[in-house]
Amino acid sequence: TTRCYHKAAQKMCRLMTEDYGNPSSLHCKGVEAEQAIREAKKILAGSLKVQEKELYFTSGGTESDNLALIGCAFANQRAGKHLITTSIEHPAVLQAMKYLSEQGFRITYLPVDSYGVVRLADLEEALCPDTILVSVMYVNNEVGSLQPIAEIGRLLKNREKPILFHV
């Protein structure tokens, strides 16, 4: 959790007090809210170098993790039912993985070293033909450990079969 950027907070305050309409509504406030969302998507898409249609706004991190993990798992289950994460993930990820386990997916929880970092050798050993997704947080929210995300990405990219990578 980080402090909100001051300009972003000012913009959100204005949106919540002035442009508070339902963006799906046809009245003035709704149209203004929809325009604000389109403007935000355009700015974010440009910054992230993605298409606007690739961006989804959710209510927060837990909903985003659920959408990504559960959605990707079910959408790709024909390719495999094995998922990999770490033992120190955010509770939202761990709960999503628990749910997926109850739905018949096989979950591997990677251990971390004394600094809270995943060992690439452990990840490589855990990968199997049935693996469809790896989820590793970039910076741990409790201890601040940084995971080797670039190295994990390269490892997964070099696999014969594509594996989704959730960070």
What annotation goes with each model-predicted range?
Residues 1-167:
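Pyridoxal 5′-phosphate
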